[in-house]
């Protein structure tokens, strides 16, 4: 793969290797040279061996090949004539301490003198051979030349800004934008009964509720509700499609503000297959014993000790990979959840066990940043419902696929109040489900960081077709441009096809001079197959021992430890501090070393979460992923 002129300048001191066959007499240009970024892989595969006398790119540009050479031939002195001489950059001297001294008056720098005569602009340059130019004003205006303004009075020194001086706006008082109150109600038991109600810390679910839930869509052929207590965690389950909080708004409150009532101790879990028993999932599924297929305690997973209100939805055969099929399963489940929400609305405030106050502040004068979350947008379960009426509800929400996958801005509190109902896809280990957004670690970390002014959270869909990917990505770039931010986080779930637009998002934001920190599951199996020069600051969400998608729910998703690393990296990038180039191959020690550095600088301990090795061995791990153990 050849390089561009811009890339050749950046890699002037890297070694020069032909990317393709070149004939004798060829004048070497960027189009003849291989990308140095892939040399390591080529060497590992035995396709490339670089000798000690290999020339650098800056030395070979413009030189003539004296004999024909094949692709992947390192360019050495005997192959070329007219080799350039390049000098190494002089080492930067350490900046000395500033010395106070009287400030001398600075005379204005000599500038070309412009005179306007009639419709002509005459320029006299008192250098060299006294060049005089006469240019029509209509053309001069296009060149950006304007008529001279009045000169400053003689003897008055005009202020001159230092080349390195930065104008920093004074930090103002934090501005409270909106608040959200969450009232928590404790649930200790879930049982079936004649009606849906909440009484004495117990949820009672109407015994015949499934008879009505199945009528929500003609694609739903059956639905069952199973109450899973901690004693039942070893039971078999079909693939987990979503994990959802049970919450409802008080009064006419909207998502992201007002008061939300939340149930503690129980969650909704959506599972299902089609009539032929095919799991409603793509590239991996988490069917099996629950205790062996869930990474408990992750932002998007159940917590140990919670009661799981698990629906098992059956949809018509062959509809599991069509948009209406998975959506029907979610709608049928939400019918049941809504009855519980209505019961939750009726509880007296005396039963509140905890009141959580969330506040969104803007911080004038602090580093303004934006969080960009790439979500799936190919259809089927590759979809998300944005801003329902109820937290993680269905009614009132708009699918991002129907919105064209274009960027949609949410406030941090809208995200944390159930503003995203995820129809999750990709492998279970790296999918971000509805509960993940309800407890989104990066949003929480950045929103509460007093050194940042969080402008908002942008959700952008990942379409299937490349042309649509780049269209959406360009809209994202334009949106971020209007925000005038100083830094950006870009996250994605899963891996593979979505990395194409993930890379494009980095380019669209980075080309506007904005430092970007990217977050994705990569490691071994999800390694990036595309990239660009703006993808310098990356955080890998991998937790798995082998660096793979092992189909354990939420194993490789963004967690608090990743958010802390990303925040530290963006602060370093904004400050233009050195960030070492990533290693070519996955090395888990990189993460551990970075965590140690952050702990040392911040003076606080970062808790690293366990991975699948603490779980009972699942069937898939035993037969596929860890068969050699």
From Swiss-Prot:
Key word Electron transport present: no
Modifications made to the protein after synthesis: The peptide chain is cleaved into beta and alpha chains, and the alpha chain N-terminal cysteine is deaminated and oxidized to form a reactive pyruvoyl group.
Reaction(s) catalysed (UniProt annotation): [PrdC protein]-Se-L-selenocysteinyl-S-L-cysteine + 5-aminopentanoate = [PrdC protein]-L-selenocysteine/L-cysteine + D-proline
Pfam family, one: Gly_reductase
Major location (coarse): cytoplasm
Subcellular location(s) of the protein: Cytoplasm
UniProtKB keywords: Cytoplasm, Oxidoreductase, Pyruvate
Residues modified to Pyruvic acid (Cys): 425
Miscellaneous field: The reaction mechanism first involves the formation of an adduct (and not a Schiff base) between the nitrogen of proline and the pyruvoyl group of the alpha subunit. The selenol anion of selenocysteine in PrdB nucleophilically attacks the alpha-carbon, resulting in cleavage of the N-C bond of the proline ring. This intermediate is then transformed to the oxidized gamma subunit containing a mixed selenide/sulfide group and to the 5-aminovalerate adduct of the alpha subunit. The final product, 5-aminovalerate, is formed by hydrolysis.
Function: D-proline reductase catalyzes the reductive cleavage of a C-N bond in D-proline resulting in the formation of 5-aminovalerate. The alpha subunit has been shown to bind D-proline, presumably via the pyruvoyl group.
Complexes and interactors: Consists of 3 subunits of 23, 26 and 45 kDa (alpha, gamma and beta respectively). The molecular weight of the complex is approximately 870 kDa, suggesting a decameric structure, if all 3 subunits are present in equal stoichiometry.
Name of the protein this chain belongs to: D-proline reductase proprotein PrdA
Native organism: Acetoanaerobium sticklandii (strain ATCC 12662 / DSM 519 / JCM 1433 / CCUG 9281 / NCIMB 10654 / HF)
Taxonomic lineage of the native organism: Bacteria, Bacillati, Bacillota, Clostridia, Peptostreptococcales
């Amino acid at each position: 793969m050849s390089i561009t002129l811009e890339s050749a300048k950046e890699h002037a001191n890297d070694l020069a290797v032909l990317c393709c066959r070149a004939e004798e007499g060829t004048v070497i240009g960027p189009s003849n040279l291989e990308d140095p970024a892939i040399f390591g892989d080529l060497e590992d595969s035995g396709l490339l061996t670089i000798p000690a006398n290999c020339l650098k790119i800056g030395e070979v540009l413009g030189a003539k090949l004296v004999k024909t050479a094949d692709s992947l031939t390192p360019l050495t002195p005997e192959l070329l004539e007219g080799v350039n001489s390049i000098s190494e950059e002089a080492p930067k001297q350490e900046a000395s301490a500033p010395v106070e001294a009287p400030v001398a008056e600075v005379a204005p720098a000599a500038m070309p003198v412009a005179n306007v005569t009639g419709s002509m602009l005459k320029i006299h340059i008192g250098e060299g051979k006294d060049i005089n130019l006469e240019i029509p004003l209509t053309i001069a205006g296009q060149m950006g030349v304007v008529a001279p303004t009045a000169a400053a009075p003689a003897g008055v020194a005009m202020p001159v800004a230092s080349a390195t001086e930065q104008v920093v706006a004074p930090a103002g008082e934090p501005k409270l934008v909106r608040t959200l109150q969450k009232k928590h109600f404790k649930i200790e038991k879930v049982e079936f009964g004649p009606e849906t109600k909440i009484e004495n810390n117990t949820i009672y679910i109407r015994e015949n509720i499934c008879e009505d839930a199945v009528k929500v869509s003609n694609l739903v052929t059956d639905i069952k509700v199973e109450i899973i207590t901690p004693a039942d965690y070893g039971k078999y389950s079909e693939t987990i499609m979503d994990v959802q909080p049970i919450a409802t708004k008080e009064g006419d409150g909207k998502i992201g503000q007002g008061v939300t009532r939340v149930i503690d101790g129980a969650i909704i879990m959506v599972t299902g297959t089609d009539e032929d028993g095919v799991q409603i999932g793509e590239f991996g599924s988490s069917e099996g014993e629950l205790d062996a297929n869930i990474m408990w305690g992750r932002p998007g997973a159940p917590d140990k000790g919670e009661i799981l209100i698990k629906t098992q939805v059956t949809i018509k055969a062959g509809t599991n990979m069509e948009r209406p099929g998975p959506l029907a399963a979610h709608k049928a489940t939400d019918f049941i959840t809504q009855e519980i929400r209505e019961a939750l609305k009726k509880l007296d405030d005396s039963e509140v066990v905890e009141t959580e106050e969330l506040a969104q502040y803007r911080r004038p004068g602090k580093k303004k940043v934006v969080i960009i979350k790439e979500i799936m947008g190919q259809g089927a379960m590759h979809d998300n419902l944005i801003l329902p009426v109820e937290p993680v509800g269905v009614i009132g929400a708009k699918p991002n696929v129907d919105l064209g996958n274009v960027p949609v801005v949410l406030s941090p509190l809208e995200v944390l109040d159930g503003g995203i109902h995820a129809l999750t896809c990709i492998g279970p280990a790296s999918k971000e489900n509805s509960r993940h957004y309800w407890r989104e670690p990066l949003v929480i970390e950045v929103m509460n960081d007093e050194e940042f002014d969080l402008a908002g959270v942008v959700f952008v869909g990942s379409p299937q077709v490349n042309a649509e990917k780049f269209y959406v990505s360009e809209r994202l770039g334009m949106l971020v441009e209007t925000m005038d931010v100083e830094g950006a986080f870009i996250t994605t779930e899963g891996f593979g096809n979505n990395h194409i637009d993930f890379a494009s998002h980095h380019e669209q934001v980075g080309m506007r001079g904005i430092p970007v920190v990217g977050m994705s599951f990569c490691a071994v199996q999800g390694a990036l197959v595309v990239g660009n020069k703006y993808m310098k600051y990356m955080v890998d969400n991998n937790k798995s021992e082998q660096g793979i998608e092992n189909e354990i729910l939420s194993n490789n998703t963004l967690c608090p430890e990743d958010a802390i690393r990303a925040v530290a990296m963006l602060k370093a990038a904004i400050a233009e501090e050195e960030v070492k180039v990533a290693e070519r191959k996955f090395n888990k020690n990189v993460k551990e070393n970075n965590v140690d550095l952050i702990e040392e600088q911040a003076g606080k301990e970062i808790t690293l979460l366990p991975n699948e090795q603490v779980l009972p061995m699942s069937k898939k791990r035993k037969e596929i992923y860890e068969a050699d153990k």
